[in-house]
Design a protein with these regions (language model features):
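Nucleotidyltransferase catalytic core that binds NTPs
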Residues: 1-323
């Protein structure tokens, strides 16, 4: 994404209060003081600048740095690898998939091998992203993302649904406009099997857990229906909350497995509405196209990143040995 797209994506996060545009890559005390920041927080993966040094060393030396654990199973590098390889081994297996585990084992090994050879190249993998496990969601994690907010009796409840794969700025813009239609935004997220039936066996690239938490992180979303049906049903409209409006964007709607319009019921009830968004132009397809067309650049960037991380760790180890 370009810088403008990244600024707006971060603004869409419900935990963000202010975005500092054109921030320096190496965090300084001056920039922290300018924006009234007491501490700087970063994950436990090492961030290396062009000079090979820790980009947070200044704030660490000043005692104003806080480290948090990197979320297990979440890796930009791995996600890019998924896009390049269109692998589906990250998705949750269905009963049918499980019965074919033995036959699939060798192909899974080959796919993982291809991730290393085709994306990371011959260099060693990053110590922070190598062997990334599947992202596992706990009830505690969901509660951390949830608003725990119920609609008020007079609130106008809006329902939208989708796969929200590769959650991006286009999704954020759509959700922002949907929220403007009422007071409470309820979002249905389809499960992996449903998406595969509609879009094909290589979809989605993100698992249901990843997609649900991505949507819950949006500041415009109040609640999520996990594993929502592809076609909007009476249960969706009445049993969770009383839905006043069902909305969808201007993109084409794929028919359900019975070749029916998934929005047939809300259209018949007169509560369906199309949302026009001032789109950034970002879609699932444009992201894939960007990644694939810049494949060589991503591979080279990854090799350099790995080399820097390994060099920094080696230097730190040598320093400790001397002490």
């Amino acid at each position: 994404m370009n810088e403008r797209e990244r600024y707006e994506s971060v603004r869409g996060c419900k935990w963000v209060d202010e975005v500092v545009e054109d921030a320096p890559y190496v965090t300084t005390l001056e920039i922290m003081d300018q924006y009234g920041c007491e501490v700087c927080i970063h994950g436990d993966d090492l961030s290396i600048g062009a000079d090979g040094k820790d980009t947070y060393q200044i704030v660490k030396d000043a005692g104003r740095f806080v480290e948090c654990r990197r979320t297990q199973g979440v890796s930009t590098t791995e996600l890019v690898g998924r896009m390049l390889l269109m692998s589906k081994d990250h998705s949750e297996p269905t009963e049918e998939d499980s019965s074919e585990n033995q036959d699939e084992e060798e192909s899974k090994v080959e796919r993982k091998k291809a991730k290393v050879e085709n994306f990371a190249g011959k260099n060693p993998e990053s110590p922070y992203t190598a062997g990334v496990s599947h992202f596992l969601t706990t009830s505690k994690r969901v509660l951390q993302f949830s608003n725990s907010k119920e609609p008020q009796p007079d609130d106008r409840v809006i329902y939208v649904d989708g796969g929200f794969d590769l959650y991006h700025l286009g999704h954020i813009e759509f959700l922002r406009e949907a929220k403007k239609l009422g007071d409470y935004l309820l979002v249905g997220v389809h499960d992996d099997e449903t998406i595969r039936k509609v879009r094909g066996p290589n979809f989605p690239l993100m698992s249901l857990n990843e997609r649900v938490l991505s949507v819950l992180s949006c500041r415009y979303v109040d609640e999520v229906v996990i594993g929502a049906p592809y076609s909007v049903t009476k249960d969706v409209l009445e049993k969770i909350y009383k839905v006043n409006v069902v909305a969808h964007g201007t993109n084409s709607v794929l028919l359900d497995s019975d070749q029916q319009d998934p929005y047939k019921l809300p259209k018949e009830l007169g509560i369906y509405q199309t949302i026009e968004t001032q789109s950034s132009g970002i879609t699932y397809n444009t992201i894939i196209e960007r990644i694939v067309s810049n494949r060589l650049a991503y591979e080279e960037r990854n090799r350099k990143k790995v080399a820097k991380e390994l060099a920094a760790i080696e230097a730190a180890n040598q320093s400790e040995a001397k002490e």
